[in-house]
Amino acid sequence: MFEKYCNEKKYVFNAPLPEIFDFSVFEYAFAFWQWGEDINQIPASDTDDKKVFDYWINMCEPSYFTNYNATASFDVQAARELGYYGYYTKPFKKYLSIKAAKGYLKRLMVPKGAENVKFSPALYNHTVDFLTKNDPKMVYIYGDIDPWGASGIYGLPFTKNKKNLHVYMCPGGSHKARILSFPEPTRQEIINLISGWLKE
């Protein structure tokens, strides 16, 4: 089914299809929590293959692993400045066509001509330095089940005792967390904060 699907979509990958399949399977767990999916929607073990496949593909579209997708510019920035998450493959080695997932971002997703971009922590270091030494009027919003929150500033020492810098963690929030995602009192607090800044 996977091969047929990718052929029909005319996807071109920088790795053999079995490897793309492996990466798509690993992406499922990350995507599930990132987007705050409902565990009750996970197909039961006796669900027919087509329904399981459709559910999975809807969550982990393999075009994500092409190097010409809509996120190509972000992929380059991730490889150069931001870093990117990996997949823990060791417990699954006997089932995989890949030996390891290390370096998959540059190998699979960075556009041709940019594969050799070197990572530099300069932007990260500059950001942490700026936020440590300054108190900018900024609101950071995270969802508490979003794995991307692991790379955020929530709970870091430099966020304490700031008057203007505010960091909010949305209960049950995913990557889709927005101001409107928060319970009413917190939502209003954020709105009042930003409204006050706009009036200055």
State where each predicted segment sits.
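Alpha/beta-hydrolase fold active-site neighborhood
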Residues: M1-F119
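Generic recognition of flexible, low-complexity loop/linker segments
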Residues: Y64-N67, Y124-F130, G155
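Conserved alpha/beta-hydrolase "acid-adjacent" motif
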Residues: T89-K90, P147-G152
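Extracellular/periplasmic catalytic domains that process cell-envelope and extracellular macromolecules
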Residues: A70-A72, L131-N134, F158-K162
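Low-complexity, glycine/alanine/valine/leucine- and proline-rich hydrophobic stretches
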Residues: G143-I145, I153-H175
